[in-house]
Amino acid sequence: MVKITINGQCIETQENNTILQAAASAGIRIPTLCYLKDINEIGACRVCAVEVEGYAKLVTACNNRVQEGMVIHTNSPKAMEARRTNVKLILSQHDSNCAVCIRSGNCSLQRLANDLGILEVPFEKEIPENNWDRKFPLQRNAAKCIKCMRCIQVCDKIQDLHIWDVAGTGSRTTVDVSGNRVISEADCSLCGQCVTHCPVGALHERDDIGQVVHALADENKITVVQIAPSVRAAWGEGLGISQEKATVKRLVAGLRRMGFDYIFDTDFSADLTIMEEGSEFVQRLSEEKESKLPMFTSCCPGWVRFLKSQYPDMVDQLSSAKSPQQMFGAIAKSYYAELLGVDPASIFCVSIMPCLAKKQECAYPVSYTHLTLPTILRV
C-alpha cells in the first residue's frame, strides 16, 4: 500500500493502481473518453490529464501508476485548461451536429463538453469525408470518429479478429478497416462489440426503422413481428421502465398500437431449431464415420460468420438447420401465408432482436417456393 494525496485528500491505495483507479476508490471522478479498463489504457484523448507536484508536465491518470507521497491535483487551473483544450481539439475534427446523431443524449463527448462548459471551438474545423457501404449492417461515420482506438482494442483483444486499424498519419490519422479492405470483404463477425464500446456516434447499426414505418403504412402489406426472448425480458430497461410495468402484455399492446397485424414470440421458432438440430444430431450419430462430429449449432448468425471466416475446415460440422429468426421467416412466408390465404410476398416480417448479425442474416437470398416444410427449416 502507498499513501498519496488527491485534491487535498489523503488516500491509501494499492501500489500497482493507476491514478485513475486510486481516485475512483476515493470517490473522486476524473473524466475519461478513450479509457476502457484492461482493454484501452493508452491515454490517447488526454482528457484524464492531471497535475502532479514535482512533475514538469501533466500526466494521464489512466496509465500512470501511483507512487508513495504523490500529491495530485485533478482540477487545478493547469489541468482544467489542458482538458478543455484537448476536448476542443477533438471537437474540431468531429461532426457536432448532435441533433441528428444517433447517440445524442447518450454521448460521452457531448456530456464531457457540457461538463467543461465548452460553448465554442476556436480551431478550424477539419471534418473527414465519410465513404461507407450504406447497406452493410454495421455503419461507420468517419466524421464522428474521435480516434479513441476503443474499437481497435476491443476487436483485437476480445474478438481477436483485427477488423480495425489505424490509418493515415499526423492530423489525418484515423481508424479504418484493416488491410485497406472494404468492410463487406473483411472477416467481421458482426458481434457488435465495437458499436457497444464506441463513446460517440461513429459506429452504429444500420437503421431500418424507415422500412418498418413504410410497411406499417402500406395497406397491402400484412405486418408480422417476432420478438426475441432477451428483448421481451429487458425492453423496459432502455426506457427507464420498472420490471413490474415492462410486461409482455404492455409490449404487445404497444406493437398493436403501432399497427402490427400479428405478433409472435421467437420462442416458437427457437423450439423448432432445437428439434431440427436434435434430429440432425441423432441422424449424424447413426451415420457414424460418414458424418463429421461434433456438430455445431447454427442458431447464431454471428457464430456462423465467425466459423466460416476463421475455421472454414469446420463448416461441414455446422448444423444445416436455420436459425430461429430464419425459421420464423420461413414459416411466415410459407405455412402462415397459406393459412391466411394470402400471397407470401404481401407478408412483411419484422424481427426485434439485440443482434447486429441478424440484420445481415435476414438479407440472405432464400426461396420458399414449392419446398416442403422440412426443407424450409434447413439452410
Residue ranges of model-derived segments:
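Conserved small/polar residues in nucleotide/adenosyl-binding loops
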Residues: 369-375
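Extended hydrophobic secondary-structure segments that form protein cores and membrane-embedded regions
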Residues: 226, 295-297, 348-354
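Fe-S ferredoxin-like electron-transfer domains
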Residues: 46-190, 196, 203-218, 222
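Flanking helices and flexible, charged tails adjoining ferredoxin-like Fe-S electron-transfer domains
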Residues: 176-289, 318-322
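Eukaryote-biased recognition of intrinsically disordered, low-complexity regulatory segments
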Residues: 1-7
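N-terminal cofactor/phosphate-binding cores enriched in small/glycine residues
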Residues: 11-68
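Glycine-rich beta-alpha junction loops
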Residues: 66, 105, 158, 229-231, ...
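Cofactor-cradling patches in redox/metallo enzymes
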Residues: 51, 80-81, 234-244, 251, ...
